[in-house]
């Protein structure tokens, strides 16, 4: 989108950051009892308990947001996201095991009325020859079948926060920029094991088409070694994988087949308390890998990374997180560019390493089931290695800090339209 606000080097940038951070702290000072996972609170709530059989409902799901990314340096560009995502849809359940949803999904950014008319995977490149006016609109359809411990989904998937991908593999901001995931999904949940497998079909091609077929296959598994009991301890082993494939038998481009993947295995320890101030603490450690099975999109075929993180839930309203990341020859498919060793700002350039310290403070206050207000401030302190450009020149290693701040309001009221006999 050509109307995105790009952050530049202005003398007042530090003052802006301090003002936003002070405003954020003042806001959370009046926090009241709430759930603390902001990403999950802002995602559509897939609660089926309140759905009566043979009853037609209207869900008016909306997320209003304003997010400012003050980025500097040669890793990625800064930008601002002001807008709303609106997904009104009908919901009907003919039987306890079946559920159908039908509607539309619209993404609207303030300050523009033209949108590139193709699949949104992130901040997209403007193509003025094919665009939609008013909003980026897609049809919405979901069919859900529940069979014992398994749930099968066709159409619009339970994506985003539902996958529970770790931060280096998936950035929450995708909720504000990418198209809803569509395809097929299987979820299984037992007492000791939880699995989510999906295929997100992102780009369909016709005969003689001028772009590539693209889809992502993902799987997350979580083994519960220790579940919360009397003393509130839990210990999990999460295994996660995402694979993106581009190409297709109908592909008439000269780009060739490209298959890229990320994977991780880790350990997560969590302790909860029934207290007013300290509610929960969490530690996590994950080993990650990146693999280019086909294609030459990356200048390397394998890479690795290590992620360690800690979090505190406070006052039933705040979450404070810190993390440390170090990587070599690693590219994340859907995570933040500050975990990459490729530059998204300098074409074809790569870093010899990427060490990143991460921090975030989140505040969320739900108003019943249907509404939630949230705010988040976070930063990346990067110790990037030497930057190697395509022309053979290099930039010295540098220590930089990138800052981001956002406010959000989710509304998902449900209206009963008709009961059928």
Model-inferred region functions:
Residues 63-85, 115:
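Surface-exposed strand-loop-strand hairpins of Gram-negative outer-membrane beta-barrel proteins
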Residues 33-56, 92-100, 146-149, 192, ...:
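Short loop/turn motifs that connect adjacent beta-strands in outer-membrane beta-barrel proteins
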Residues 86-92, 139-145, 184-188, 219-223, ...:
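Residues on the lipid-exposed face of transmembrane beta-strands in outer-membrane beta-barrel proteins
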Residues 58-66, 102-106, 154-158, 197-201, ...:
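Transmembrane beta-barrel strands of outer-membrane/channel proteins
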Residues 78-86, 133-139, 178-182, 211-217, ...:
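Residues that define the transmembrane beta-barrel architecture of outer-membrane proteins
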Residues 164-168, 297-300, 304, 315-383:
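Outer membrane beta-barrel transmembrane domains
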Residues 399-421:
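Outer-membrane beta-barrel "beta-signal"
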